[in-house]
């Protein structure tokens, strides 16, 4: 099955956000390095940039929104899961043209690609609680 340009943008954004989180480099450095070094064919590049920059810009607000729904301390959440949650929370809160069910489904699908065996269930549970808290259900 062909992956949509937006799905590819989300997958690339998760990878770039993870790199930003681990490396502590600026979002500009991470973005430049990522688009230079990775195959960006089939990626909605403007949406990738919007997701990456928006998530980093609003990361504190996003973490505050997510915190009540986590079942453990933030630093105990798997870094990949945390990255997917941040990206999905950004989309839920700031990309209002994307239906909330699409955001949740995309978070689940990206978790199936990058997360551990049960990551998609964890992501689904949190996003399902977060969406109504953000007025998206």
Swiss-Prot record:
InterPro entries: NusB-like_sf, NusB_fam, NusB_RsmB_TIM44. Keywords: RNA-binding, Transcription, Transcription antitermination, Transcription regulation. It comes from the Bacteria. One of its GO terms (biological process) is transcription antitermination. Signal peptide: none annotated. GO terms for molecular function: RNA binding. Pfam families: NusB (PF01029). GO terms for cellular component: cytosol. Belongs to the NusB family. Involved in transcription antitermination. Required for transcription of ribosomal RNA (rRNA) genes. Binds specifically to the boxA antiterminator sequence of the ribosomal RNA (rrn) operons. This is Transcription antitermination protein NusB.
């Amino acid at each position: 099955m062909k992956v949509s340009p937006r799905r590819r943008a989300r997958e690339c954004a998760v990878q770039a956000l993870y790199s930003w989180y681990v490396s502590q480099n600026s979002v500009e450095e991470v973005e430049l390095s990522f688009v230079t070094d990775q195959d960006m064919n089939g990626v909605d590049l403007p949406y990738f940039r919007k997701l990456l920059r928006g998530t980093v810009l609003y990361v504190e607000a996003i973490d505050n929104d997510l915190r009540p729904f986590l079942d453990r301390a933030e630093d105990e959440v798997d870094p990949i899961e945390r990255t997917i949650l941040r990206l999905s929370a950004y989309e839920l809160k700031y990309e209002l043209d994307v239906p909330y069910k699409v955001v949740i489904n995309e978070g689940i699908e990206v978790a199936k690609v990058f997360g551990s065996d049960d990551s998609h269930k964890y992501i689904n549970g949190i996003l399902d609680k977060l969406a109504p808290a953000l007025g998206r259900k």
